[in-house]
């Protein structure tokens, strides 16, 4: 697209800010709160349209609010307090997101992913599973799922995991059986494998807190609005029954609903064996990497009472540097990690301001009045269903989470009977699982969609079927299991 045709992407966020700012301030809100909300909404529109990278959009929004803080961030009462310096306070607010533990946890997880990539351990694990399980097409589907499952806890970019590690491996498999893209032979085995690639990425993105950046964004938003949080272990245990069910069910379900013509063969295991021989035996760097990852997972699951999850990640990254698994240049040059670091920290800062100015509490009271008289369970399920279905309207999981999660959290806070940890975990799971609905929902989606093995009609049909199954199972386990371990 030519720059001259993109002007509207720049003007739309500004127009939204202006329109909201000109609307009379609603009853119960102060003027600075309403103006803050106007800028916040403009940032969300900017994240959706992306005239510039998302991190830049968020930083511009923070800059506007901080510079105009006497009118957008602070109340007249605050400004009138003796010794109150809005310049220092606004700067402190602007950079507050960078001290959030969630930010450093996801940054550490990105470095773990770099270690997997540099040592070749991630590729080796996937090839071993393909070699051992690739004799039957159904088992090959499980190999794809297990590969994603092993990589997910330490790869917070589902795009890097799905499109960067798994896809480059599995795209080599269909041609071994003369299953070609954009051809009638694609259904031989290629279509099943490619569908398993994207559906496994979506499932594993929901299983672990550190499997997808928006999961951590949600926790940051939750903490800024309520001071409550979910640890890595809370997320893992809360998702455990649903995780086991989906990991075991999905490959078989895909096999039944989108059956491959070819049921078995030896070409894939032989190819994987050749690739493994080319890699050579497990080297010392891979062994060190494996040991550190196992240690990190153990501490994340069982060490919550003794050490913060972010501190675990921070310490493991330091050990990775000392053990020469990664270099300092790897950290400095990791554009993806720094990109997420900046936009996630900036969005958490903006969400904190939304709460500090009183908008969240006002919106919660507004919802409380409209939701009164309904069962908390019915309200919770209805909110999850609405949140899930709105995924159709977003091409970015980050924009989706940034736009809707604060409203979902405010709605839950409006009804004290709704258990916030359970509700937020259901919202978090919906972010990952709902990514299966469309071929544009998350980073790897267009990669698999564009592989030539997944026709448009098939993708939308399977997305709707699997999406519905995921939603039903999420609601059931959310109501029956999550309260047992989270409350």
Swiss-Prot record:
Q: Keywords on this record?
A: Antiport, Cell inner membrane, Cell membrane, Membrane, Transmembrane, Transmembrane helix, Transport
Subcellular location per the Swiss-Prot or TrEMBL entry: Cell inner membrane
> Topology relative to the membrane, per the entry?
Multi-pass membrane protein
Q: What is its main location?
A: membrane
Q: Does the keyword Secreted apply?
A: no
Pfam families recorded for this chain?
A: Na_sulph_symp
Where are the coiled-coil regions?
A: none
Signal peptide annotation: none
Entry's Gene Ontology cellular component terms: plasma membrane
Q: Known InterPro entries for this protein?
A: CitT-rel, SLC13A/DASS
Residue ranges crossing the lipid bilayer per the database entry: 10-30, 33-53, 54-74, 93-113, 137-157, 189-209, 236-256, 292-312, 313-333, 340-360, 370-390, 393-413, 418-438, 465-485
- Catalytic activity, reaction form: (2R,3R)-tartrate(out) + succinate(in) = (2R,3R)-tartrate(in) + succinate(out)
The GO molecular function terms of this record are: antiporter activity
Q: Which PANTHER family match?
A: DICARBOXYLATE TRANSPORTER 2.1, CHLOROPLASTIC (PTHR42826)
Q: What does this protein do?
A: Catalyzes the uptake of tartrate in exchange for intracellular succinate. Essential for anaerobic L-tartrate fermentation.
Regarding protein family, the annotation reads: Belongs to the SLC13A/DASS transporter (TC 2.A.47) family. DIT1 subfamily.
- Protein name as annotated: L-tartrate/succinate antiporter
Annotated organism of origin: Escherichia coli O6:K15:H31 (strain 536 / UPEC)
Query: Gene name, please?
Result: ttdT
């Amino acid at each position: 697209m030519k720059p001259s045709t993109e002007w509207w992407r720049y003007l739309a966020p500004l127009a939204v800010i202006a329109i909201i700012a000109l609307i009379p301030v609603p009853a119960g809100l102060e003027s600075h709160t309403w103006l803050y909300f106007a800028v916040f909404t403009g940032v969300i529109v900017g994240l959706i349209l992306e005239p510039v990278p998302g991190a830049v959009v968020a930083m511009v929004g923070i800059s506007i609010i901080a510079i105009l803080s006497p009118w957008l961030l602070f109340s007249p009462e605050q400004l009138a307090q003796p010794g109150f310096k809005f310049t220092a306070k606004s700067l402190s607010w602007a950079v507050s997101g960078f001290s959030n533990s969630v930010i450093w946890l996801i940054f550490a997880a990105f470095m773990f992913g770099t270690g997997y990539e540099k040592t070749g351990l991630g590729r080796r694990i996937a090839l071993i599973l393909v070699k051992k399980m690739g004799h039957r097409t159904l088992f090959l589907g499980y190999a794809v799922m297990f590969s994603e499952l092993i990589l997910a806890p330490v790869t917070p970019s589902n795009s890097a995991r799905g499109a960067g590690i798994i896809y480059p491996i599995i795209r080599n498999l269909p041609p071994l059986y003369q299953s070609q893209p954009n051809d009638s032979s694609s259904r031989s085995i290629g279509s099943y494998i490619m569908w398993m690639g994207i559906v496994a990425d979506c499932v594993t993105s929901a299983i672990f807190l550190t499997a997808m950046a928006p999961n951590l964004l949600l926790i940051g938003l939750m903490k800024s609005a309520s001071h409550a949080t979910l640890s890595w272990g809370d997320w893992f245990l809360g998702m455990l029954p649903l995780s086991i069910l989906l990991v075991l069910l999905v490959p078989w379900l895909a096999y039944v609903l989108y059956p491959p013509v070819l049921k078995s063969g030896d070409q894939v295991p032989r190819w994987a064996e050749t690739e493994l021989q080319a890699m050579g035996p497990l080297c010392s760097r891979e062994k060190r990497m494996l040991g550190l990852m196992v240690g990190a997972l153990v501490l994340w699951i069982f060490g919550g009472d003794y050490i913060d999850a972010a501190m675990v990640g921070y310490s493991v990254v330091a050990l990775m540097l000392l053990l020469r698994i990664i270099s300092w240049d790897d950290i400095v040059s990791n554009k993806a990690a720094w990109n997420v670091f900046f936009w996630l920290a900036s969005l958490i800062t903006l969400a904190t301001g939304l709460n500090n100015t009183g908008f969240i509490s006002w919106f919660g009271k507004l919802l409380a009045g409209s939701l009164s008289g309904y069962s908390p369970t019915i309200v919770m399920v209805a909110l999850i269903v609405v949140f899930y279905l709105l995924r159709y309207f977003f091409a970015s999981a980050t924009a989706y989470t940034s736009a809707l999660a604060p409203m979902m959290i405010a709605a839950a806070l409006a009804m004290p009977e709704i258990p916030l940890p359970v509700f937020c975990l259901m919202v978090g799971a919906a972010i990952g699982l709902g990514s299966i609905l469309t071929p544009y929902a998350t980073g790897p989606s267009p990669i698999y969609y564009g592989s030539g093995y997944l026709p448009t009609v098939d993708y939308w049909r399977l997305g709707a079927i699997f999406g519905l199954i995921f939603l039903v199972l999420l609601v059931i386990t959310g109501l029956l299991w999550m309260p047992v371990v989270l409350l």
